[in-house]
Amino acid sequence: MSCYTREQIEAAVKAKGYAWFEGAKDFDVNIVGVRNSDTGNKVTNAFDDCITISYKEGGEWKSHCWPATTDPGKKGVQQYHNAAGVARLVEGQYRGSHTLGLHQGKYEALKQQKPVKVYRDPNRDLTYDENKIAEGVFGINIHKAGADSTYVENWSEGCQVFKKAADFESFMAVCRKAAAIHGKSFTYTLIESADIK
């Protein structure tokens, strides 16, 4: 899936009625994941989505778009750790849902701190079922895979995961600057590629 411009992301977010942050201070970030609509509910095991971040610095808009997954991988679907089934984040805007914190106690990432909605799929058939929704704090973090991972596998059991570690570090550098100005809470928005015109 190709990446998008800030204007495309902003228009799609506003069209959904979600907040778009553009305060007077620098680094009022908009973190938006874009799920690839073309793959439907099939487990592709690929980093075929993207994560974007848009913000102003010195009064000028800046934006970045990186390959990622917003879906669990094949191993995540088949070997999940929650008895209710693997989690797949429901599209929406989750205000203040994440904070700077350690992913699995290992390295700094954006860690879920407030409830989000997830689809739960317990049947391991490599098709995401969307008929059962749960809401809560499930550890749906925003983190990295390997240096440059090819397959999602169990890098995600519902987390939003960057394909490349270097891209994730660039993302986190912006988040740290944002936290120094606006505090450690971050809003995460997930949309579909079909939402982008």
Tell where the protein language model's regions lie, with residue ranges:
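Residues immediately within or flanking Cys/His clusters that coordinate Zn2+
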Residues: 156
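Soluble non-cytosolic domains of exported or imported proteins
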Residues: 162-165
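Cell wall/extracellular polymer interaction/catalysis modules
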Residues: 1-153, 167-176, 182-186, 191-195
